[in-house]
């Protein structure tokens, strides 16, 4: 099943200055992003001709001289493989016999191989839960006592084809534990909604991350699951591929502008290598109600990345199939909420979103509201100085024209 749409690609608000724009253009040249004005975006569920349908979603964004591939799958834990090529003709090749075997190496390829400019992956390995009862925000371990985590490799997922929406370029992976003796997910689910975009814009709901045709958005929602404590905090364990012996870098950006995400002045980024390369971008906020707003905002904390042994993590067949078995993994945790304030316990709802992309991460310019406030704040003193100068000038002129009668 497939849906496609022409989408405009451009810097838009991503360029704070002409000098920075030229710098970005020069460095983007190796990635084949020069001159990209449009991208043809398509979503396709790759069929398994050998047996039951498997959830393998391919997002393909084709430009004049480049292609971006995002391959999502719930085979094992939910994962995405990101690939950027310098040709509009690169294709995804899937060998289902290999992919579903105990040794899936080579079961997933982007061809031609020599066109690949960047590739990496994210794997959402575990759903975490902590008991924050009687824990203060100033405690040494403010998250509280951990419950046994839910391995996402042991989840049962919906048929992704049923949720594929070509009109919005979106699809949703929705799952629950296969073994749930306490029935904590009897009326609940964990959902990962993936969406590609036809142009640079913002969603209507917070945190309103600026996106382009070079990005796709992931919205994670925990809905209706029964917490194991009265004030449970939830989180996600996330694994990614290291760059050689090193882990990707985590950066924080701060702003004076919070119009798009009220009371949130920070943007977090995960960067694979030096720019331009791949990135993940999110605001450190989650929401305990739908739609999200200031009153339901929860803090989102990201732990430092650390090297992780592959055998200690739930394994993703698509990551193994594309990258092989000899890889350095790094992991970090995202946790949502605090022991005080709003939380999942309010409505048994939690949502958080991030952007994934290739190239330079979108950069927020100042919103029209903030620009207006700054113009007034900076313009008023200037007008007062100008007015004062005119008064002094006219006053001086009046006295200079006075002639003594003597």
Curated annotation (Swiss-Prot):
Q: Where are the transmembrane segments?
A: 373-393
Q: Where is the protein situated, by its record's location annotation?
A: Lysosome membrane
Gene (UniProt): GLMP
Q: Where does this protein come from, organism-wise?
A: Homo sapiens (Human)
Q: Which family does it belong to?
A: Belongs to the GLMP family.
Functionally, this protein is described as follows: Required to protect lysosomal transporter MFSD1 from lysosomal proteolysis and for MFSD1 lysosomal localization.
Specify the signal sequence span: 1-35
Q: Pfam families in the record, alphabetically?
A: NCU-G1
- Domain of life here? Eukaryota
Q: Which intervals of this chain are the motif Lysosomal targeting motif?
A: 402-406
Question: Could you tell me which residue ranges are on the Lumenal side of the membrane?
Answer: 36-372
In its record, the post-translational modification comment is: Highly N-glycosylated. N-glycosylation is essential for GLMP stability and for MFSD1 lysosomal localization.
Keywords, A to Z, come to:
Glycoprotein, Lysosome, Membrane, Signal, Transmembrane, Transmembrane helix
Membrane association type = Single-pass type I membrane protein
Q: Topology: which residues are Cytoplasmic? A: 394-406
- Predominant subcellular localization, coarse grouping: membrane
The entry's protein name is Glycosylated lysosomal membrane protein
Biological process (GO) annotations held by this record are: positive regulation of transcription by RNA polymerase II; protein localization to lysosome; protein stabilization
The entry annotates sugar attachment on: 65, 134, 159, 187, 230
- Complex formation: Interacts (via lumenal domain) with lysosomal protein MFSD1; the interaction starts while both proteins are still in the endoplasmic reticulum and is required for stabilization of MFSD1 in lysosomes but has no direct effect on its targeting to lysosomes or transporter activity.
Regulation: induction: Transcription is activated by TFEB.
């Amino acid at each position: 099943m497939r849906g496609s749409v022409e989408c405009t690609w451009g810097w838009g608000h991503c360029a704070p200055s002409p000098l920075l724009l030229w710098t970005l253009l020069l460095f983007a040249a190796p990635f084949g992003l020069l001159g990209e004005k449009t991208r043809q975006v398509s979503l396709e569920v790759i069929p398994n001709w050998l047996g039951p349908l498997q959830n393998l979603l391919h997002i393909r964004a084709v430009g004049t001289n480049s292609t971006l591939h995002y391959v999502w799958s719930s085979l094992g834990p939910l994962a995405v493989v990101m690939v950027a090529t310098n040709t509009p003709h690169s294709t995804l090749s899937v060998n289902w016999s290999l992919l579903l075997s105990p040794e899936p190496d080579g079961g997933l390829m982007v061809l031609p191989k020599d066109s690949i400019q960047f590739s990496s992956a994210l794997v959402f390995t575990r759903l975490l839960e902590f008991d924050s009862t009687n824990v203060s925000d100033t405690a040494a371990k403010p998250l509280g006592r951990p419950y046994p985590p839910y391995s996402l490799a042991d989840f049962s997922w919906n048929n992704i084809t049923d949720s594929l929406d070509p009109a919005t370029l979106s699809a949703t992976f929705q799952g629950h534990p296969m073994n749930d003796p306490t029935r904590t997910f009897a009326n609940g689910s964990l959902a990962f909604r993936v969406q590609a975009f036809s142009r640079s814009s913002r969603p209507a709901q917070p945190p309103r991350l600026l996106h382009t045709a070079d990005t796709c958005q992931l919205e994670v929602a925990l809905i209706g699951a029964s917490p194991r404590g009265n004030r449970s905090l939830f989180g996600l364990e996330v694994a990614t591929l290291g760059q050689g012996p090193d882990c990707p870098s985590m950066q924080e950006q701060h702003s004076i502008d919070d119009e798009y995400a009220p009371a949130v002045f920070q943007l977090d980024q995960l960067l694979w290598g030096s720019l331009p390369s791949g990135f993940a971008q999110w605001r450190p906020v989650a929401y305990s109600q739908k739609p999200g707003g200031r009153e339901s905002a929860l803090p989102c904390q990201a732990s430092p990345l650390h090297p992780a042994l592959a055998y200690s993590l739930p394994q993703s067949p698509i990551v193994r199939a594309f990258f092989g078995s000899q890889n350095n993994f790094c992991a970090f945790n995202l946790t949502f909420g605090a022991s005080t304030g709003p939380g999942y316990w309010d409505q048994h709802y939690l949502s958080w979103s991030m952007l994934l992309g290739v190239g330079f991460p979108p950069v927020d310019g100042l919103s029209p509201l903030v620009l207006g406030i700054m113009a007034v704040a900076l313009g008023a003193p200037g007008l007062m100085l100008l007015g004062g100068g005119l008064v002094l000038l006219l006053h001086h002129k009046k006295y200079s024209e006075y002639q003594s009668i003597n």
